[in-house]
Each structure stands twice: as structure tokens, then as C-alpha cells.
Amino acid sequence: MGIQHLDVSKGGYSRVTFSKNLAFFTGHAAPQYQTLKEQAEGILKRYDELFKQFGLKKSNILYTTCFMKNADDEDEFADIYFQWIDPKNPPAGVTVTALPIQHSPVGDNILMELSFIVATNDSLPIKRYDVTRGCRMVEYDGMAYFTGHVYPKVDTLGEQVAGVLNRYDELFEKFGLKKENVIATNGYSKDGEQCGENGEPFNA
């Protein structure tokens, strides 16, 4: 099967793209609701509908990306999210404080946006490592998906980046992975003006 783009919008987005045993969802929001709790429940209800529509399973979610307007809302979202996912098969993922684009005419009250990467081939095993409420790493079809890591023990961005990368060195050794096989990275900084500090430890 090639690449399938489904429910393509006028804005140039596909609601979901299928490729190589994976489903990639565009971020979903629910600005018609006023509170974070209502928006989270509305988004997850919509994903229930979409998973049913496309024949997907919550137990096959590999990776979650959540953008939140207010960091103080994270615990409230987590309570709802962890009740919704399959507790025996939690995904890796990241939750980031960011300002989601406020879409008109859908509304200017977007408090969060949520997207998933989902496995589509039940014949391929999914391995989850260091499982608690979530998991540190998910392995599927020759790919490894890591939960986002932070290192708040030190003060500067450069020191935190170095600390995170040292932790990844340990994890790569633990799981038998190689840095030359890294396909993509995501890094999120509290202060965009400090992003230059990222370069030296990251490129080392």
C-alpha cells in the first residue's frame, strides 16, 4: 500500500495519513467547549469516532503529541487522558506548553491540541519499555519512539540539553540503538531566544 491521504481539507491538511503500517493524525482541537476538561473530553470522543471509522485500536497508539496553552492544565488533562488510553498499552509521547493557532471561524478558545501516531498492522509486535502510566519507549516495525525527556536539575538551557542527551546516551546503550540511526528529533524550548544554546551539546 502506498501513501493514503484521507479527509483532505481546503487548508491543505489530511485528517489522517496512512503509510507503511502507520496512521498519522493531524492535531485535533475542540474550541466549541470552554474548559480544558470539556475540550479534552471532546477531542478524545472525536478520536473514538475516528478510530472506529478507520478501524484503529487505542491499544495500538504508539506516540501522542499534546500542545497545551496553559501549563497549569497538564494534570487535569493527564487525569482524563490516562483514563481514555489502554492502560496495558500506554504510548510514548510529549506534552508541551505552547499556544495553539487560534482558528477562525472555529473559535479563539483553543486550550489544547492532540495528535496520535497509530500502528495499523496487528501482525507486527509492539514492544513497550519502562511502562508506568505512560512508557519511556515504544518499538514497532523497526522504529523506536521515545517519550520526551527533560533535565530540570540544572539552570541553563545548554546544561539541560547536555543532561537530556547524556540520558539518551544511556538509553541508546540500554536498548541497543545507534545515534547514526536517528531519523528525526523534536526539541521544545521555553525561551525561543535561547535556542542557540541548544547547538553546541546537540551537535557534539
Task: Mark where each language-model region is.
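N-terminal presequence-like segments and the immediate start of the first folded domain
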Residues: 1-166, 170-204
